[in-house]
């Protein structure tokens, strides 16, 4: 039992260091944990290819790679025409490759503990990582000894403290909130579609608890988390309504309704109680859910951040920049954080369309690999375009992971249409 817990904790750290990359104080700032996992992924790929006797890459990954190259080339054209030196997205193909090989590193690590790494295993580890980040963020904020220990090895703590922001081990600000949102969408997918979850009240409660913790604490780390909370809750609610097929209410449906209802009541009661008795938790909720408190108290749904964001909708004033951009994005040079504005200034509408097509393809190609994935693909697509209204972002990490793991759609021959990105070896479960 202890051995399994240790293995599980190590695997959770591997997933966390990939999803929430960190820079170490004792290494050059350009090196982060995701790169180490990517190197491990390359070695695992080479080993698996030699063992299998061939190097295989799925057609979906090749197509995604071609689209990433196209975007990088277009960005190169943009900065060349504009005679600028900002290569932020010119090197996107390298980011793509790092995320993909890192995802295979995560997959290879999980395979050491599980014979087959499927979507259920991946989502459970993502949920565990989300909870881990939230718990460590609270510990860092409330215990100076723990905070000092983390800051001794991980870069960034001093900046977040000066900014009065809650942070975890790699989870902070909008990038952290966006990754929390992706995790919430995937939790909702597992809750809504997986029969092993639907038939197990403990699994349902565990996932709902993880979802709730990420919603509450994750929103304090970054209010962008609420985007994933809204999308995830909408999917869970839709799935509960959809259970009633043919006009009949079954015992299983009633059990699911009761579990969901009591879980939500418990979370609400917990939040109200600690909001009343804990000054720290009171501050957390006031910050994370500022818009809702403002709406309840003043009738206006707004936050300080949205007020600032409203002033950042700036656009080019010449047709050439609208079309191909002017190759500027770094260091707030465009006077905006908004993703759409920055993409247009950097690579124009054409570049924005290429990048949008890349994410649409990556999200929707998984529909052929995973059962009941259409709504999830739609939510991931919606998440991509919603958060661009606030910041430039990249959620390819989840697509890279989905490219690597085993699929669950059956072909006509009865075999899983897995289309793994890279070859798999059969390892025994420890």
Locate each region found by the language model:
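Transmembrane alpha-helical segments and their membrane-water interfaces
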Residues: 42-52, 78-135, 358
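N-terminal signal-anchor transmembrane segment
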Residues: 1-52, 73-81, 398-401
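Loop-to-helix entry and N-terminal half of a specific, functionally important transmembrane alpha helix
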Residues: 9-15, 205-210, 364-392, 396, ...
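A juxtamembrane structural motif centered on a specific transmembrane helix
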Residues: 1-7, 48-53, 197, 248-259, ...
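Alpha-helical transmembrane segments of multi-pass inner-membrane proteins
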Residues: 120-148, 171-221, 226-239
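Transmembrane alpha-helices of multi-pass inner-membrane enzymes
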Residues: 43, 187-189, 233-236, 377-385, ...
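Hydrophobic transmembrane alpha-helices and their immediate junctions
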Residues: 234, 346-385, 413-414
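Membrane-interface loop/short-helix elements at transmembrane-helix boundaries
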Residues: 275-324, 332-342
